[in-house]
């Protein structure tokens, strides 16, 4: 038998034999005879063209090979009037039945076109209607392997997808996805609430003349196979015209047999030129096709140069291959998009009657032509390659496919024109450019550079206009070091990374650091806009008290009633003037008995004595027994205990909020055990800090022991500060403005910045 195709002729004495087309799953060369059925074994890659050739034959063409076995002793029964074509469900993934009716001439099988796939429940009202020889209809029949078609009850011709038990293993190893395109050509067929369009040919008369009521149509069923290891021409088709009907239909070019399937395609192209103008779709191709995408192995990308040499008719190329062939049916934005946006809530007739809007020249034309149904019955999302346009059902297959484009994978988006630095991160590229600016910051930046073009083209947020720089940008300088940058954000990151250790309190808005929380609180007012200090003489308000004093001195200095006789400063209150005069003249009447400290009032002197010269804490906390010098401090501390669980000691009245503090209390007070042991001298301590102090005696470093208390340290400066601040009455560092004494110069400088800032301006 010819390898290009086979012809199965029907004798006139045979009325209607059964023709069964089944896929070849390891049964090549074996014909199955079952009573009145003629079994034809056909491989997966096959083209079945049901084209009218003459009155006595039906042509069966195969792309690879087909074996036809005829049984000479076939018994015919007059009661059998059904012609059935049984195909395995694993090929199409859905149960489809194509129903064809014969014309008035019983010897000639007319060409029919199934324009829509229906569910059996939708077609139930039409099955009961009597058969009309001029009617072409379509039906879905769901049958099992043991279903018997009753020829006495129906006179219609069926194409049934049969669920074969022999191919269960094949179905379980692959996931096929069915894509069905809804045709927009033909007449209307109302099924329940859905208005669908079908088109068909009427039968011929005995003299061979055609009626002009419907236009001529062609049915093509292609099954494509493509191997990823060879460069083949896939999708080659030939449009059969009306003049080709008497002759033999040309077999399509296909790939050889014995290859693993990459993409399997069942394609049926329907063309009706008379009804294109009614649907405003004259430029689009009417398609009915089913596509199966199997992702077992990678297929090579198809370039535009290969497609120009290929004899593929692009007017009937499926939408899934349009991008690979260089068509503009789909955009190459690289996003995962479904094939069709039609859901169950949208009626099919509404989707079929959508008018295609005219687009401007140069824009892509997109048409809802297909839907991919996954194994769960839901629309499938595909992931296209933004380089070659090939689509995949998962991100994993797309990532594996991207290895075929190594030039695009390892190509960096940002390239420095001054050196060989490349990166994919915009921030890294910007920081690198800042390093060049610091070196040549005195040089003028050219008006337009290659960096300006590349940087703004690569940036997704950049506009289409090129930025021309004709002057040097403003540089933000760090006030703590010599760092300079053109962006405030980079300066903030520099402050956090470099100077945050010296400034423990950092502003979360601008990353500016401060040594004291009061300075940070004052600074935060510049971001919040809060101005708590108001002038009593006008509506002026500010965020800093020193600024308010400066305002009063400069604006209302001559208007204030109480003026100082020794300086130009004036006050609105007599007490403020008296306090200022006492501080300025140095007349402090309240002398500390323990040191040379003097205060202007008794309350200040009392605070001084309690905080400096006494170790007594008369105000105890009832919860944790912590002591404080003043009641205000105890009240502030008591707020921390509200809403917290109090841990009570079992041996005494000690209470605490911290369970670890309670454990230390029990170990140190109620037990004689010394848990912290020295490894050198085996001496025990109740607390870990006591052990640390003891370990300094074994380190070989000099230990400074205070002669007035048990304080000891290895730091000479720390020991000196301890003696001066605790055990001496001398305040050698005096303020130049108020004569207040301090033990350390840093305390004096801090005092001047807080209280005498206006005098420094």
From Swiss-Prot:
Tissue: Present in ovary and brain but not in other tissues (at protein level).
PANTHER family reported for this sequence: C2H2-TYPE DOMAIN-CONTAINING PROTEIN, ZINC FINGER PROTEIN
Function (record text): Transcription regulator required for brain development. Probably acts as a transcription factor that binds to the promoter of target genes, leading to activate their expression.
Similarity comment: family membership: Belongs to the krueppel C2H2-type zinc-finger protein family.
Protein name as it appears in the record: Zinc finger protein 711
GO terms (BP aspect): positive regulation of DNA-templated transcription; regulation of transcription by RNA polymerase II
Binding site for Zn(2+): 564, 567, 580
PROSITE patterns, per database record: ZINC_FINGER_C2H2_1, ZINC_FINGER_C2H2_2
First and last residues of each zinc finger (C2H2-type): 383-408, 414-436, 476-499, 505-527, 533-556, 562-584, 590-613, 619-641, 647-670, 676-698, 704-727, 733-755
Alphabetically ordered keywords of this record: Cytoplasm, DNA-binding, Metal-binding, Nucleus, Repeat, Transcription, Transcription regulation, Zinc, Zinc-finger
One Pfam family hit: zf-C2H2
UniProt remark on domains: The sixth zinc finger contains a Phe residue, Phe-584, instead of the final His residue normally found in C2H2-type zinc fingers. There is another His residue a few residues downstream, His-587, but this is not involved in coordinating zinc. Despite the His to Phe substitution, the zinc finger retains the ability to bind zinc using a tridentate metal-binding site of Cys-564, Cys-567 and His-580. The zinc finger also has hydrolytic activity against 4-nitrophenyl acetate.
A GO cellular component annotation in the UniProt record: vitelline envelope
GO MF, any single term: RNA polymerase II transcription regulatory region sequence-specific DNA binding
InterPro entries named among the record's database cross-references: Transcrp_activ_Zfx/Zfy-dom (IPR006794), Znf_C2H2_sf (IPR036236), Znf_C2H2_type (IPR013087)
Subcellular location: Nucleus; Cytoplasm
